[in-house]
Amino acid sequence: FRMKVSCRNFLEYDCAADLEKLDFGAMEGGVKHIGGGSNLLFTADFPGTILHSAIRFIEQKDGSLVSVGAGVVFDELCEWAAERGLWGPENLSHIPGEVGAAAVQNIGAYGVEAKDIIRTVHCFDTRSRRFTDFEVADCRYGYRESIFKSEEYRDRYIVTAVDFVFRRDGAPVLGY
């Protein structure tokens, strides 16, 4: 839409440890963390700081367990998994956005939701200034919902990485 809007500061980080260096309480005008911006439209200037994750890694840890940086484009993860014969995210291919946002929004399509393949969401707690992990059961996933969208958690936790569990069975989900 080419909106002529701006923010006070735009900070992109490529390492989760960089978040520990920020003084969130001292940032004038507030702080907003964004993903790729595919579901976002600023219609006025933002007086504060915008943060964006450039944490981009995909690491196969143990067979079907894959750890992914929050800044990875979700469709790139789908392609990566397909190239390795890993099943689970294929129905979510071409959904715009990044891995961190996928965990926050519980993206879904064709009978599959992010919660079905997420094991752990790794976060930075801006209040305690510590890293913490949320197992999938703790994320309170629902239809396009999660604990990270709640009033209490929305601006408190920043997703830094997500662990997924994929399958090797070669069986697509076709029950939609």
Residue ranges of each PLM-predicted region?
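Anion-binding (especially nucleotide phosphate/pyrophosphate-binding) glycine-rich loop
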Residues: F1-V121, D125-R127
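Phosphate/pyrophosphate- and phosphate-bearing ligand-binding catalytic cores of soluble enzymes
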Residues: R2-M3, L40, F131-Y176
